[in-house]
Each structure stands twice: as structure tokens, then as C-alpha cells.
From Swiss-Prot:
The keyword Methyltransferase does not apply. It comes from the Bacteria. One of its GO terms (molecular function) is DNA binding. The keyword Coiled coil applies. This is Transcription elongation factor GreA. It comes from Bacillus cereus (strain AH187). Keywords: Coiled coil, DNA-binding, Transcription, Transcription regulation. Belongs to the GreA/GreB family. Necessary for efficient RNA polymerase transcription elongation past template-encoded arresting sites. The arresting sites in DNA have the property of trapping a certain fraction of elongating RNA polymerases that pass through, resulting in locked ternary complexes. Cleavage of the nascent transcript by cleavage factors such as GreA or GreB allows the resumption of elongation from the new 3'terminus. GreA releases sequences of 2 to 3 nucleotides.
Amino acid sequence: MATEKTYPMTQEGKQKLENELEDLKTVKRKEVVERIKIARSFGDLSENSEYDAAKDEQAFVEGRITQLENMIRNAVIITDNGEESTVVTLGKTVTFKELPDGDEEAYTIVGSAEADPFEGRISNDSPIAKSLLGKQIGEKVAIQTPGGEMQVEIISVK
């Protein structure tokens, strides 16, 4: 028997998924059913692009509902007491400077379900996070990126 994949996430991340699931079940699902109903009224379904598009959207919505239910059911909540730490762990925000130029970057390391690089939230499965997890303030770390290896020094962990 295979074990189900777990999804590490913050309580906030789980709440966002629950909100999306609720919206899909209560709003989107009904909208799609209504679109299918309207498209059916146009007659011949064999050449009815509105019907095909609505059925495709229905399949997407139902697939996303299943995916969200699975992620929520298998969520492992990352607890963070908000205190500074010396070790980079899941749920923490790590600030590091690139060597030798000193440019600083900060990322919060979260589970893949709530990663959003544009918001500074990177997946624990990303190359940057994998390189930083378990390291301490002051450590110099080599990070493999698509542009090559970069050397960084960890400045803070919150």
C-alpha cells in the first residue's frame, strides 16, 4: 500500500486552499453547470463549441476540486512561533547575501502547495530552499541555479 503524499503548509496557506475549494464548490461549479445547460439549448451537441468549452471547464473545475481536497486532507501544518532562529527550517524567512557583491535576498520557505516566488515564498523542493534548509546564520552556501552556481552567506532566519 502506497502512502499518500503529504503537503507541508502554513495554516494561512491551508486556509487559502480551503477558501478556493469552497468557491469552486459553491460558485464555479454552479456557473459551469449553467453554461452547459445554456449550450445544450443551442441544439446539436456534435458541433457545439460552447458546449465543448463548458464541458472542458467542468472537467478542470472537478479536477481542481479533487486536487484541493487531497492537498487539504494530507496537509501537514508548519508551526512557527515567530521567534528568530539560527537554523533555516520550513516556514522560516531566510535572508542571505550573495557573495562577493553583497546583494541581499529574502525568501520564506514553504511547501509547494503555497509557493509563490513573486511574493517571496519558495517551495521547499526548489534548488534554493534545498541548499538552505538545515543551514545556520553565518554559513556560506553554494546554490545551484539555472544561471550557474552562486555563493551566499545566511544573514538572518526569522
